[in-house]
UniProtKB/Swiss-Prot annotation:
Pathway(s) served: Phospholipid metabolism; phosphatidylethanolamine biosynthesis; phosphatidylethanolamine from CDP-diacylglycerol: step 2/2
Enzyme class: lyase
Organism of derivation: Oryza sativa subsp. japonica
InterPro entries associated with the record: C2_dom, EF-hand-dom_pair, EF_Hand_1_Ca_BS, EF_hand_dom, PS_Dcarbxylase, PSD-B, PSD_type2_pro
Catalytic activity: a 1,2-diacyl-sn-glycero-3-phospho-L-serine + H(+) = a 1,2-diacyl-sn-glycero-3-phosphoethanolamine + CO2
PANTHER family reported for this sequence: PHOSPHATIDYLSERINE DECARBOXYLASE (PTHR10067), PHOSPHATIDYLSERINE DECARBOXYLASE PROENZYME 2 (PTHR10067:SF17)
Cofactor field: pyruvate
KW Transferase (keyword) present: no
Gene: PSD2
Modified-residue entries (Pyruvic acid (Ser)), positions: 569
Membrane topology term: Peripheral membrane protein
Family listed: Belongs to the phosphatidylserine decarboxylase family. PSD-B subfamily. Eukaryotic type II sub-subfamily.
Keywords associated with the record: Calcium, Decarboxylase, Endoplasmic reticulum, Lipid biosynthesis, Lipid metabolism, Lyase, Membrane, Metal-binding, Phospholipid biosynthesis, Phospholipid metabolism, Pyruvate, Repeat, Vacuole, Zymogen
Name listed for the protein in its UniProt record: Phosphatidylserine decarboxylase proenzyme 2
Active site as annotated: 425 (charge relay system), 481 (charge relay system), 569 (charge relay system), 569 (schiff-base intermediate with substrate)
């Protein structure tokens, strides 16, 4: 049902005795369109008309006779994704809202397992997925329809040939002349191919018309690569090809062609929500050379954002820092001038500021800041996990040290004490030795295990051991848990400063964050790992470090151990030399100076001393 558009009489206007029949009344739809045209004309001729119309339009409810219907918009967007057998297969689709006040605000998202989706027959119908509220995964804000299929290798080759052809298609006619073909062969870096360019051109030109089109080039590349590879080097980055098969070479070059253009047809690495919304592409796959994009170490000290790898979703996540804060932290922590300021009183200033802020966040007035905080991190705090209702928190600090519902953080291999687990919701770095940590991450000139643990907790086994760093951000769950089962031997409180634990400071050679900050060192004596040092380190704005266990207590891995009051903070666990084998994915990310986003209870590593589990059993209890 609906209103049919009115039909006007098409007769010419001539004299006549009879009156012309009256025109039918315009439909509601036509009246609505007419008003839109008039408004558009008025706005076009009136300065500031848009603002006026917007203001008046939102100031009143719509009248019944003005309602024409609800526009249903269908957006079709195709994205090609490289799927590896043992690689990432969870795709995240994010919906952003953009207006004059807020740019690219995440309003909904969904996640889909591509492996699961590809096993379904979606040729005749699409899969409808629910869009979830970023602040509460239990709330549905909309739906999205997607379809997915495996691209035929021939289609992949043709698509690749089209991209390659565009490099030297100077007149943009979709075809290659002999001179353009010659330039393409030279770009491929194959000396043998250059010597017989004309022969290859004739071989490609199947119909003998003196030009090579896209289909002919695709056929040449496909056939010749099997016999005598034409492409020795990537024409974009110069990397040597042929290490794998031709499909991997094609994927590598396609990613190179796409990078930075904002016109990506294929994704082989990982995008953050922010990067995807801006159309950025960063190469972080096995087909790309990692040196082309610096993560962690360099970007952490020079950029206004930090990239971390989400272990659960296998995605990069962008941790954005306010630009003004970045500038101030660089000035303070990454310059000799800043070092001078630190030595002349900034240490005391930061400490006093943190103490005052801690008191403020424990006052009843601070409760009003909770909604603002949730709005700021609405896509990173899941309120469904919080144990107590939001209205029960009487101060900001009560909310900040909130407890989670039972089962919100399952513990990997709970009955197996040979498996260590993550101690905090955090960004994690693992290192097999102190030398590795200082080479890849910690740039303070005076960092050492002895300095970290203090003179009262000295052990040669620990000093030569391995370490893991858990960095907590303000939006994280701020209670820390026991990573291994054992007996608590001692607690040693070490006074100190309250520098930030942000990578901008950690990566600085001018200050020694971990060995100068206020911290509490506890020793856990275990049968599986020997002695493990658990170091809770305060940071800027951290009012206090509270422990819930005492000396002599036996603790089981996953037990709640303590919490940090308001601010960012860090936990460092030091294991004896060769006592633990960290999980391979954590070590691989750390080797690239890339932090891994983990949750309490995720697997950290396995004891090298008492291996009660077989490798296949270890896989079963892996919690990621």
């Amino acid at each position: 049902m609906g209103h049919s558009p009115s039909r006007h009489n098409a007769c010419g206007g001539g004299g006549g005795d009879g009156e012309s029949p009256p025109s039918p009344l315009p439909s509601r739809f036509e009246r609505f369109r007419r008003r839109l045209r008039l408004r558009h004309r008025d706005r076009a001729g009136r300065p500031g008309g848009d603002a006026h119309a917007s203001e008046s339009g939102t100031g009143r409810a719509i009248a019944v006779d003005e309602f024409a219907g609800i526009a249903r918009i269908r957006i079709v967007k195709e994205k090609k994704v490289v799927v590896e057998t043992n690689g990432p297969h969870i795709a995240r689709i994010s919906v952003f809202e953009t207006n004059r006040f807020s740019k690219n605000t995440l309003v909904g998202y969904c996640e889909v397992d591509l492996f699961e989706l590809l096993t379904k027959d979606l040729d005749e119908h699409s899969e409808v997925l629910s869009l979830l509220d970023p602040s509460s995964s239990a709330t549905i804000v909309g739906s999205i329809s997607i379809s997915c299929y495996i691209e035929d290798p021939v289609e992949t080759e043709q698509s690749f040939a089209r991209r390659v052809l565009a490099i030297v298609d100077y007149n943009e006619d979709g075809e290659l002349s002999l001179s353009e073909f010659s330039d393409l062969m030279k770009a491929f870096g194959n000396k043998l191919a250059v010597a017989k360019i004309e022969e290859l051109f004739r071989q490609a030109d199947k119909n003998g018309d003196g030009i090579v089109d896209m289909d002919e080039l695709a056929a040449l590349l496909a056939n010749q690569q099997e016999k005598e590879p034409l492409i020795s080097n990537c024409p974009v980055c110069g990397e040597i090809l042929g290490k794998h098969d031709k499909i991997n070479d094609m994927i590598h070059m396609t990613l190179c062609f796409d990078e930075g253009t904002g016109n990506q047809i294929m994704t082989g690495g990982f995008l953050t929500d922010k990067q995807a919304s801006y159309g950025w592409m960063f190469k972080l796959s096995e087909w790309a050379h990692f040196s082309s994009y610096d993560v962690g170490l360099h970007s952490g000290s020079t950029a206004s954002h930090i990239l971390v790898f989400d272990r659960r979703t296998k995605r990069l996540v962008e941790e954005v820092i306010d630009g003004k804060i970045v500038l101030s932290m660089r000035a303070l922590y990454q310059s000799k001038v800043g070092l001078t300021l630190i030595d002349t009183g900034v240490k005391d200033l930061l400490k006093n500021l943190s103490e005052k802020q801690g008191k403020k966040m424990s006052s009843p007035e601070s409760a009003k800041d909770i909604p603002k905080f949730l709005e700021l991190f609405k896509d990173q705090i899941n309120l469904d996990e919080v144990k107590d209702p939001l209205e029960s928190f009487k101060t900001f600090n009560e909310f900040f040290v909130r407890q989670l519902k039972p089962g919100a953080r399952p513990i990997a291999c709970y009955e197996q004490d040979t498996i260590a687990t993550c101690a905090a919701d955090s960004r994690l770095m693992t290192f097999s030795s102190v030398d590795e940590s200082t080479r890849l991450w910690i740039k303070g000139r005076k960092f050492s295990i002895e300095g970290l643990l203090g003179k009262d907790v000295h052990s040669d086994a620990l000093c030569n051991g391995s370490l893991v760093i858990f960095r907590l951000a303000p939006q994280d769950y701020h209670r820390f848990h026991v990573p291994v089962s054992g007996t608590l031997e001692k607690f040693v409180e070490i006074p100190g400063c309250l520098y930030t634990v942000n990578p901008i400071a950690v990566n600085s050679k001018y200050c020694n964050v971990f060995t100068e900050n206020k911290r509490v060192v506890s020793i856990i004596s275990t049968s599986e790992f020997g002695k493990v040092a658990f170091v809770a380190i305060g940071a800027t704005m951290v009012g206090s470090i509270e422990f819930l266990k005492e000396e002599g207590d036996y603790v089981h891995k996953g037990d709640e151990f303590g919490y940090f009051a308001f601010g960012g903070s860090t936990v460092i666990c030091v294991f004896e030399k060769d006592a633990i084998e960290f999980d391979a994915d954590l070590l691989a990310n750390s080797a690239r100076s890339l932090e891994t986003l983990v949750s309490v209870g995720m697997r950290l590593g396995v004891s090298t001393r008492n291996r009660d589990l077989q490798p296949q059993e270890l896989e079963k209890c892996s919690l990621e």
